[in-house]
């Protein structure tokens, strides 16, 4: 059986892989076998971390909203929290997601306070009229 020299095809494949791993350190950017292993590992990490990024940002938004809601204890609500705010939003059928609420909380706290006050006033009206 004759030997097949894999000239430019193999070289082209390796250079394509090396371009991907050019920013890696040490042997991870020089040796072909370790480059392929690190490429697989990098792509797996990227795929996994795209999902965890979504979870982390949702957690951050919830923490920000809760901190600002609890910061201002109003006379009508001795303990108003994130969970009560979200519950009241769902009852009123308001379409404000956590990302928008967190942006409002950071940029304009008074606006978030106004939203929570309106929700609570609506809640009082429902309870007094016996709609519940």
Swiss-Prot record:
As one GO molecular function, the record gives: structural constituent of ribosome
Q: Its family? A: Belongs to the bacterial ribosomal protein bL20 family.
Q: Main localisation, per the record?
A: plastid
Indicate what this protein is called per its UniProt record.
Answer: Large ribosomal subunit protein bL20c
Against SUPFAM superfamilies, the record matches this protein to: Ribosomal protein L20 (SSF74731)
User: Where does the record place it?
Assistant: Plastid, Chloroplast
Question: What is the stated purpose of this protein?
Answer: Binds directly to 23S ribosomal RNA and is necessary for the in vitro assembly process of the 50S ribosomal subunit. It is not involved in the protein synthesizing functions of that subunit.
Q: Which GO terms describe its biological process?
A: ribosomal large subunit assembly; translation
Q: Which InterPro entries match?
A: Ribosomal_bL20, RIBOSOMAL_L20_CS, Ribosomal_protein_bL20_C
Q: Which Gene3D superfamilies match?
A: 6.10.160.10, Ribosomal protein L20 (1.10.1900.20)
Give the CC-aspect GO terms: chloroplast; ribonucleoprotein complex; ribosome
Keywords, ordered alphabetically: Chloroplast, Plastid, Ribonucleoprotein, Ribosomal protein, RNA-binding, rRNA-binding
Listed PANTHER family? 39S RIBOSOMAL PROTEIN L20
